[in-house]
Amino acid sequence: MRLVPLLLALSLSTSLSAAERETRIPEAALATAATLREQALADDTGWKVVESLTTEIGPRLAGSEADARAVAWAQAKFKALGFDKVWIEPVTFPKWERRSESAAILGAHAQPLTITALGGSPGGIVEAEVVRFPTLAALEAAPEGSLQGKIAFVDYQMQSARDGSDYRNGSAIRGKGPSAALRTGASGFLMRSAGTDNHRVAHTGITRFDEGLTPIPAASLTIPDADQLARLAALGPVKLRMALDTGWNGEATSHNVIGEITGREKPEEVVLIGAHLDSWDLGTGAIDDGAGIGITMAAGHLIGQLQQAPKRTIRVVAFANEEQG
């Protein structure tokens, strides 16, 4: 809800001459923003929006049936929240699907492992020896052809931080690791889940393969399973079987959903905020980005409840296909 004061100030403010090189927000606008902020902090609209989306729709992978239901849900929610105008814009994109995935250690220490395919990974079955690397840089430094027919495993352990700053390293492994593995001749790619948790649900996200490379199966191991694989690798060579039934399947069309509070004096000038409506398919997407949908819809709703409409138009967009786009 902390977006509300800034939105209101932007929609109500006037600027001084260019020579003064500064913008002054009128006291009346600041007072209204402060009042609105207190209302927002005491209001549960955002919470109810997130609860509704995650309960009634749940996971909503771009291009899926649930994604289509989410679009209809968002249109209805904007209207219920009192937005003046509600409309949709079509968005067409390649459609990636996850059907099944599994992995297992073979041989004397045979046991199952819990994985999830990375978004954009092709399907396939790989049975090969695992070669462990502590970091992405170590994999990138491996000589060309040195992992011919093997599975590259990047076992980078993210560090917990209040600002989540180490996530950029985890996401870099997801984004760049499969292509780095391909350059070494690897037949498959595994990474330790990008997170600092201890449950057996692996983190997913989009990966991309560099132009000119033939994609290989790529997956994320849960942190407990990555620990287990690392311990086994310390004992000696480990052979693993990874089977993914995933891949691109034509095109799909989803929609951006837009709700608008019309400005009273300068409706053609628009203050735009937004969040993405789609999520990955393994959870309800409450944080990524259900919370953003709740915050932005609620902000627009509360501004729309003011006795005086904002000077400029407030436009809230629930964007399609952010996760894979």
PLM regions and their residue ranges:
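Structural recognition of the beta-strand scaffold that forms the well-ordered cores
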Residues: V49-T54, W87-I88, V130-R132, I151-D155, ...
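Bacterial N-terminal signal peptides
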Residues: R2-S15
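Noncatalytic luminal/extracellular "stalk/propeptide" segments of secretory-pathway proteins
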Residues: R21-A31, T35, E51, T55-D163
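Stable alpha-helical elements in mature extracytoplasmic
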Residues: A29-T32, T45-V50, I57, A66-A74, ...
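Soluble metallo-hydrolase cores and metallopeptidase-like ectodomains found primarily
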Residues: L30-T32, L106-E144, T207-A286, A298-H301, ...
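Acidic, glycine-rich active-site loops and adjacent beta-strand->loop/helix elements
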Residues: Q157-Q159, G195-T196, L277-S279, V317-Q324
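Sec/Tat-exported extracytoplasmic proteins
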Residues: A40, T54-L61, A74, F78-K85, ...
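Extracellular/luminal Protease-associated
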Residues: S64, T114-P217, T284, D288, ...
